[in-house]
């Protein structure tokens, strides 16, 4: 049947994943500058430049929350909080050794 679409059934999925919830642990994402930028810059092909993404991150007011989220969730792809996956691994290792 064609007609009005009931989107209310999708809302539980948003809550499940913590999306679009002001009280969720990703509430900072709506302030992220990367949300206004080409996402491909943050997920470059192997060997591709990360410079543009890191430049955006450097100006972003939620960079620290973004980096913490990526580290806490073991994010393995892309630039998060101004760091590549390799840089995040090194950061985690260095901070673990200091603790």
Swiss-Prot record:
Residues involved in [4Fe-4S] cluster binding: 34, 57, 60, 66
Subcellular location: Cytoplasm
Main location: cytoplasm
Cofactor entry: [4Fe-4S] cluster
Keyword Protein biosynthesis: no
GO molecular function ontology, one term from the record: metal ion binding
Conditions for induction: Constitutively expressed during all growth phases. Repressed by osmotic stress, not responsive to a number of other stimuli.
Keywords assigned by UniProt, alphabetized: 4Fe-4S, Cytoplasm, Disulfide bond, DNA-binding, Iron, Iron-sulfur, Metal-binding, Transcription, Transcription regulation
4Fe-4S Wbl-type domain: residues covered: 33-90
Function, as annotated: Acts as a transcriptional regulator. Probably redox-responsive. The apo- but not holo-form probably binds DNA.
The protein's name: Transcriptional regulator WhiB2
UniProt organism field: Bifidobacterium longum (strain NCC 2705)
